[in-house]
Structures are given as C-alpha cells and as structure tokens.
C-alpha cells in the first residue's frame, strides 16, 4: 500500500528488488483480514508496478476458509493479468494467544493444495505464473531451512528469530553480531535436530512436529519475542498437536507415493 510512482522509480534505479504483496483473496475476504480499502490499494499498486516493468508477485496465506478461492482459475487469471510473475502460498500458522485454530486447513484441504500448486506451475496445463507453497514444497529444500540453516528472521525490535513464524530468541541484533546471533542456543538446537522429519511434507518443528519446538525452547531458555502477545511455547504447540496427528496420515501416504530428496540440498549438521 506504500507503492507509488516515486517508489517504483527507486526500485528501477537499484535494480535488485522484487515485491511479494500480501493478498488473501478477492475484496470481501481480503479486506476482512487486511482492513477496509486494502484490496483496492493492492490493485492500484500492482498496476503501478506493472506499468514500470517491475517484477512482483503475491504472498497468500491460505486457511480453511479461502483455499478454493486463492487457487481458483478466476483468481489466478486476475493476478496474472495484473502482472504477477510468482505467487507464494503460506499455510496458516496459529501463532498468537488469540489465533483461531479453526482456520487451520483440514488434511483434505492441505492434500488438495499439494496437488493444486503442482498443477498451477505444471509445464503442461499450468498457469503463466510460478506457484510455490512454503509448507508443501519442503521436499525441494530438504525440509525446514530456518534457525540459520539457510534463513532466519529479525523482527522490528531486533530480535533474531529462527523463522518469521517462530517468535522465540535469546539474541538481539542491536546487542550482538549476526554471527553471534546465529550461534545462540536455540539456533544451535535447530541445527542439531534438522531435518525435523525425514518426510519433508512434515518439515516444521511447530506445525507438524510441535513436540520438538517445545523441547528446544524449553531446553535453551529462549524467551517469547512476540511483540503483540507474548505466548508460552506450551500454548503455541498445544494448538498444533491435533493438526499434526491428522496431517501425518495423509502426509506419510503422499510421501510414500511421491518420495523426493534433493541430494544437493542436504546441508545439515553432520551427526
């Protein structure tokens, strides 16, 4: 919503930026989550980015309520027409004390996403956009990449967190170097445990393996860094336990039918 002509011109000048624009569906659904009027602002921003020849895509959080919409031909054709080159799909994470667990997709819905995203980006019969699923594409990067394996997150307060969805840390970038932050106990525990599951359709230490995140946070003494609503790791992981059990059955069946291990992407700690 901050994109204007001046911003686009600056993007052209630096030449090394692309934007992922948050979008949850069409106007009614999107504005219910993002705020009234945001959908129209996003559409206007896309028009400006396209007119300046810039590369951009969408960042879509899929939930039990919007999965069919955000993967529909109508929706995809719309964002392609607007100029999107890629679309990131992010599985809803029940982070925060007031997170609605009923927004977690069912195992049937998540299995649908597994097949639908591969269909969208298929060389035959697909769409003219590259679709990626942060959760269901774990097989292509060897599972969880967080905790400094290939990625970490720094929040607005400077707390160095293992992932944008995992708000626990014991290091702040204002107080230590990046190297020191990457060596904090929680990150080292991540490296000790990765991959968190040999089935890379169950990659996350929170969503699909909640007992592991709880153990790591408790053993390392990491503190909640949630800026809005600090949450105990027991409360967070408790919301994922039933989901993890339900998804395991479907995920194991999918993995048995379609195993995939990227041999060049196994940069785990030697054990």
Where are these regions (language model features)?
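Short, conserved loop/turn and helix-capping segments at secondary-structure boundaries
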Residues: 36-39, 104-107, 111, 171-176
């Amino acid at each position: 919503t901050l994109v204007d002509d001046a911003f686009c011109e600056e993007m052209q000048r630096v030449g090394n930026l692309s934007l992922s624009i948050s979008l949850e569906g069409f106007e009614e659904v999107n504005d219910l989550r993002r705020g009234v009027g945001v959908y129209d602002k996003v559409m206007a921003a896309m028009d400006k980015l396209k007119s300046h020849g810039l590369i951009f895509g969408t960042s879509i959080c899929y939930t039990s309520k919007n999965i069919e919409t955000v993967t529909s031909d109508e929706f995809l054709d719309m964002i392609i027409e607007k100029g999107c080159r890629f679309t990131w799909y992010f599985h809803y994470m029940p982070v925060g004390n007031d997170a609605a667990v009923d927004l977690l997709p069912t195992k049937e819905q998540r299995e649908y996403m597994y097949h639908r995203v591969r269909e969208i980006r298929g060389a035959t019969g697909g769409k003219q956009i590259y679709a990626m699923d942060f959760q269901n594409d774990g097989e292509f990067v060897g599972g969880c990449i967080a905790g400094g394996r290939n990625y970490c997150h720094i929040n607005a307060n400077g707390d160095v967190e293992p992932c944008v969805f995992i708000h626990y840390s014991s290091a702040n970038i204002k107080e230590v170097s990046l190297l020191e932050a990457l060596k904090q106990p929680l990150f080292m525990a991540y490296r000790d445990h990765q991959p968190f599951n040999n089935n890379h359709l169950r990659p996350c230490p929170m969503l699909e393996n909640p007992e592991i995140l709880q153990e790591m946070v408790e053993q390392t003494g990491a503190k909640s860094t949630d800026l809005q609503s600090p949450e105990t790791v027991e409360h967070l992981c408790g919301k994922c336990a039933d989901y993890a059990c339900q998804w395991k059955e479907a995920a194991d069946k999918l993995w048995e039918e379609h195993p995939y291990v990227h041999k060049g992407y196994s940069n785990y700690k030697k054990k």
